[in-house]
């Protein structure tokens, strides 16, 4: 026909009792970007005028019948302020899709624009013809397109909005194309409000709908029964990120894993396998924090969300621990690290999640609540609260620092640029240099409990090392009396270790025993004594060099755990902290030193790396466990809006750009096949 569409004409000289038409086509369904087009400079902004030579060639598609009152009213509401032609077409298409309800209409022919607007509904061909009229009245060349729409079920359910069809299907469809200089004919589907993509297969594009009808003609009067059927069959599929294997291939992989597992068990090879997969943001993968920077505005929040999603699967009643991560040259502060610890025997390390604070919430914790918590904790530990030391920022240092700043910098205003020192100083000045930062409790573990004591200092108060890290990392330990003491030796990982006791129960019963029946005063074997009197042999100069810190920060209460050599001591202190939190109805965040390395506990961690976050997943001792860990991790990461793919500048598909290491070993060093 004049539009270049192929037309077949069939003439039947004799009467026929049936007519069957079968259409078969093979369509590559490679995903395309419908916005990937070039626009001539003069047409980048709407409205624009076609050049004279184009107007002649586009004359049939610019023909504008007189608009009825409904159509004129609809067009009159179109915002014609200058803007990007792409944005204009998208908004026009979406407005029509929202205002015209789609309906299946089996009657022949196409509704007029007036009918469609009056009814507020129509079939795909009715909406397409209406959009053709609207575009032409706005000075845009438009044509009617008839063809097929193929929709395939998604490999992965969508995180936002509907996931699309549950089964593959195809149907006859109609949509509109608008001619944009440079880009050519751009498909707009007013039924869905989307641009035409790889699933829109055009068979005919014409100035009038009648010319694009798939079948037209006549028969003599007769009784007709009509039926149709359309189906889609996937002939070939390439492996892709969302579906790398067929079901048969995946079954073979699982079977092979079981076979290897059986051989390892038969030979008593106690191999474990973990990993360090990396992830990037699905929404903003081009931001510096997801390309080159180790830290950024969203990385920690997404990591905390992922950790809380993984925790119920891997380690319910586990400890969430916030700790210092790696520190590389050129970075102003150490990186953060989020960790989750749990006991291998299945007993709780942290009993009640109500007492683990949510980092996104402000609990209104102030200095008074921090002191109340610290005093209650000392009672549970059986030490005197007289050893609690309030900590302050070093006012003299910050007053000196303030005087060294340029005279034109307003430290209490917005003129801070990106200078870390100035930002830190401004925050401190706003809070007040005389405010208590938190409380420190010198603390050491003994076989029978806990010991505390005072810290002799040259200055009357304890002033923290300048900085903005947690106060536990800024204690002036170098100002304490020099002692010749042996560092506590960690438990050897090659030793046989006794099972862990129920330390939560022990802490609760010991605390109850400290109080005489009906009395409110504390009774303890060490009551009224400093720890130096109890264990003078521990430290030469009589000063404990480790401490627990309690700090109100950002409306939450942070407990900084001291370094402890034995896991039992760490768990006992942790249980005391939780019982205190429950007693005061005050959730806490646990930070500071991690539990000592021990074969009786397990962990996974999430840390930042340049351009990615890295998940240090715990080792698995069997193939089914490894499959479960891997599938759970990647699914929960996706639901957190973290993915494993990026695109290079020219569009090439690539991975995260971070390492994806595999770690091999054993449950204990003695069981490692390599050692």
Please give the residue ranges for each predicted region:
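Aromatic/His-enriched, Gly/Pro-containing loop or helix-boundary segments
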Residues: 2, 8-13, 614-638
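Helical (often loop-to-helix) elements that flank the catalytic cores of nucleotide-handling enzymes
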Residues: 186-197, 622-636, 666-675
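Glycine-rich, histidine-containing beta strand-loop boundary motifs that form or position
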Residues: 146, 561, 590-594, 617-619, ...
């Amino acid at each position: 026909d004049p539009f270049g569409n192929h037309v077949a004409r069939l003439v039947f000289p004799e009467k026929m009792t049936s007519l069957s038409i079968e259409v078969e086509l093979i369509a590559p369904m490679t995903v395309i970007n419908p916005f990937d087009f070039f626009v001539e400079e003069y047409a980048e902004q709407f409205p624009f005028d076609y050049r004279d030579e184009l107007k002649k060639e586009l004359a049939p598609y610019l023909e504008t019948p007189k608009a009825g009152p409904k159509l004129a009213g609809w067009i009159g509401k179109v915002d014609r302020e200058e803007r990007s032609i792409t944005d204009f077409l998208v908004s026009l298409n979406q407005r029509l899709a929202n205002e015209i309800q789609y309906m299946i209409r089996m009657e022949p022919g196409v509704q007029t624009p007036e009918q469609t607007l009056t009814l507020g509904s129509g079939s795909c061909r009715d909406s397409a013809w209406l959009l053709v009229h609207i575009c032409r009245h706005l000075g845009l060349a438009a044509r009617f397109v008839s063809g097929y729409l193929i929709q395939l079920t998604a490999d992965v359910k969508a995180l936002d909005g509907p996931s699309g069809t549950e089964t593959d299907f195809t149907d006859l469809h109609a949509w509109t194309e608008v001619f944009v200089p440079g880009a050519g004919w751009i498909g707009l589907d007013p039924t869905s409000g989307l641009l035409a993509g790889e699933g829109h297969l055009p068979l005919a594009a014409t100035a009038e709908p009648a010319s694009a009808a798939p079948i037209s003609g006549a028969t003599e009067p007769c009784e007709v029964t009509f039926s149709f059927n359309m189906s889609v069959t996937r002939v070939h599929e390439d492996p892709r990120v969302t579906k790398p294997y067929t079901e048969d291939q995946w079954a073979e992989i699982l079977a092979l894993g079981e076979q290897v597992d059986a051989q390892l068990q038969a030979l008593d090879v106690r191999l474990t396998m973990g990993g360090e997969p990396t992830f990037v943001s699905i929404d903003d993968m081009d931001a510096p924090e997801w390309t080159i920077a180790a830290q950024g505005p969203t990385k920690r929040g997404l990591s905390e969300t992922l950790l809380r999603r993984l925790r119920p699967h891997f380690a319910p009643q586990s400890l969430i621990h916030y700790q210092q991560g790696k520190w590389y040259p050129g970075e102003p502060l150490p990186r953060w690290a989020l960790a989750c610890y749990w006991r291998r025997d299945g007993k709780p390390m942290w009993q009640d999640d109500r007492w683990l604070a949510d980092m996104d919430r402000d609990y209104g914790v102030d200095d008074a609540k921090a002191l109340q918590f610290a005093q209650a904790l000392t009672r549970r530990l059986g030490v005197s609260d007289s050893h609690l030391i309030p900590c302050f920022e070093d006012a003299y240092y910050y007053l000196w620092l303030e005087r060294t700043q340029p005279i034109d910098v307003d430290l209490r205003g917005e003129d801070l640029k990106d200078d870390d020192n100035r930002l830190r100083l401004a925050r401190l000045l706003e809070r007040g240099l005389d405010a208590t930062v938190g409380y420190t409790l010198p603390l050491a573990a003994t076989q029978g409990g806990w010991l505390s004591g005072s810290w002799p200092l040259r200055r009357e108060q304890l002033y923290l090392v300048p900085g903005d890290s947690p106060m536990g990392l800024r204690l002036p330990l170098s100002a304490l009396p020099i002692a010749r003491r042996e560092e506590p030796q960690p438990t050897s990982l090659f030793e046989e270790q006794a099972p862990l006791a129920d330390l939560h129960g022990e802490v609760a019963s010991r605390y109850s025993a400290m109080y005489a029946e009906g009395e409110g005063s504390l009774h303890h074997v060490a009551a009224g004594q400093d720890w130096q009197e109890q264990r003078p042999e521990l430290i030469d100069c009589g000063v404990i060099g480790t401490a627990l810190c309690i700090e109100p920060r950002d409306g939450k209460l942070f407990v900084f755990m001291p370094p402890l050599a034995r896991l039992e001591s760490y768990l006992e202190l942790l249980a005391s902290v939780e019982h205190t939190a429950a007693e005061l109805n005050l959730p806490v965040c646990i930070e500071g030193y991690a539990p000592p390395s021990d074969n009786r506990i397990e962990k996974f961690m999430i840390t930042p790396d340049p351009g990615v976050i890295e998940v240090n997943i715990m080792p698995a001792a069997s193939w089914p466990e490894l499959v479960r860990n891997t599938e759970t991790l990647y699914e929960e990461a996706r639901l957190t809006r973290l993915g494993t793919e990026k695109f290079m500048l020219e569009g090439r598909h690539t991975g995260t750009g971070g390492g994806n290491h595999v770690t091999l070993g054993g449950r204990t060093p003695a069981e490692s096949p390599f050692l």
